[in-house]
């Protein structure tokens, strides 16, 4: 009798399934018998299965048709076969069945509602329900890590050597010892190595110990000499100190050497050596492919480079001899003239004892190298060299690894250097456009300002209230305003284009007596003018400046004198006594610098020719010295002797301003190339300190005139830098320069920030004028 269609047997193959989707997850762990039993059944019934399959194919076709007509929810035999791991290929006459490995052929087919238990007979013959063990996969309810099947704990497995079991599972059942094969089985297992095979046995379960994919990948990386953890980077990016840490100022500002910009002569020699070899045929630039392949094969041969190496003992006591110093220019056979000794120097050298001579030879000059005689002291020098190498002890000097921060001087904390301005106390608003200049009067009560709107305004310092203003021009801006430094008057000077105005503003603190004294000082000089010509001017030539009244309208507002020069005035600086002031016109060329005498209404041009364009000028606070700054240098002149004293070289590309310390021995310079330079006039003409703290040009620099060790600079980046600059009385000590505060408040308009600043004559306060049209008082 032929078997039914539902009892078809499956052919078991050794190939692995192509994907997990073709096999239902219910079949995991369903194989309860060994593969040997399946192989034996397959060999015995091979011929019987062929006949059964042919007879059962027709019955399966009829059942498939009936099942498909009854319900759509019930899968057909072909679909059931696919669910059971069988691939069915239907044809018109026959049905081919291909069995898929990993599926138990004896297990009955299950539908979607299959139960997770089976019915067995107990010892009394009653039915007993045996449930399948739960497989805690990722989709199951148990998401914890899989526990070990053997729950005996961490005890030696030798305790179970005399028992047939090796432990107990979580339900208390004995875990029987698995059967072990003979030597032939072990040999066959080693030949047919499955994936993850190790040849080891798990002592807790007795089963072969196999490796998973992650463990196999770890073993592969170790065998290849790679890092076990693929996420670890064995070569992290090194962070060098001098590139990883951003420095505000360079550790070394030395200029680049010339050899950096010249081609290497050694490389040229190597290249010419290769060129000659190619020309002579010793080097073939092109090799046939056959020779190239042979060379590549030879290069691929690996060998141990340390095979014949003999270990050598390192002698730590050996120190190489120091090298002789290279010869200098004076040892040349044709040295420069400045190296040749004079007659007096030669006689003095010959009178000295050989031990007292600085050099053992005198430079000599020869016309050619063939005329140079033999050196008579060669034997003596070589003997002394040998004696030095033999007798002089040698010391190995270790290179010091010093942190660059430890080389910097220990500066005091800014909190210990107070008082200095920290916050913006008052904001003055009223100008239309930029405020180009600002100045505090000698009494410290009023502030004067000038801007692009052509007006000069006077404000109360503490309240910020405007007390006086005058319109000097409607077309040109007020470039600068400066107060007369003497306290016996209340005189303000302002420059608009080619005109310099002297005025007496009205203020609540100005008494009638002080106002009258100021007007008398300005009017006293008109008695020295004769026929409208200046004293000292050659007859028939135009005077360097014209002193005149500005007009009735301006005189009623307090403007008393107008001085007209030949070009636009950018800078005004007063002498400490208040009788002289200097004006600078950068576009004036010969008449760019002028010195005016207030008591005589006299203007003088001190320079007939000035090397470079004048940028600013200032008087020395104590001595009769006059400083004039061009684009790159600052020249110091003696006004009594009428001679040049020194030329200070800051090293800046374009000087914007400078100021002299009240002590007279130090100088600070601001430049358009973002640098602030401190000069010690007694030390050198070069800068003592160079500070690069700004990102834009430095417009103005000022010392505090009231005895406080403070100075500041204003920049186009919209900030003011406040510094503590202490000048010691002892000339052997260096000045102490500490940056203490950065004042931010002005806005940058059209790449212009803070244009001018000035200190209070007594308090640690300062005012600043910005391109945003505001004036700020910092306290």
Swiss-Prot record:
Name of the protein in its database record: Ribosome biogenesis protein erb1
Annotated function: Component of the NOP7 complex, which is required for maturation of the 25S and 5.8S ribosomal RNAs and formation of the 60S ribosome.
GO molecular function terms noted in the UniProt entry: large ribosomal subunit rRNA binding; ribonucleoprotein complex binding
Subcellular localization: Nucleus, Nucleolus; Nucleus, Nucleoplasm
Record's keyword annotation contains Acyltransferase: no
Superkingdom of origin organism: Eukaryota
Membership in a protein family: Belongs to the WD repeat BOP1/ERB1 family.
Entries under SUPFAM superfamilies matching the protein: WD40 repeat-like (SSF50978)
Gene symbol of the encoding locus: erb1
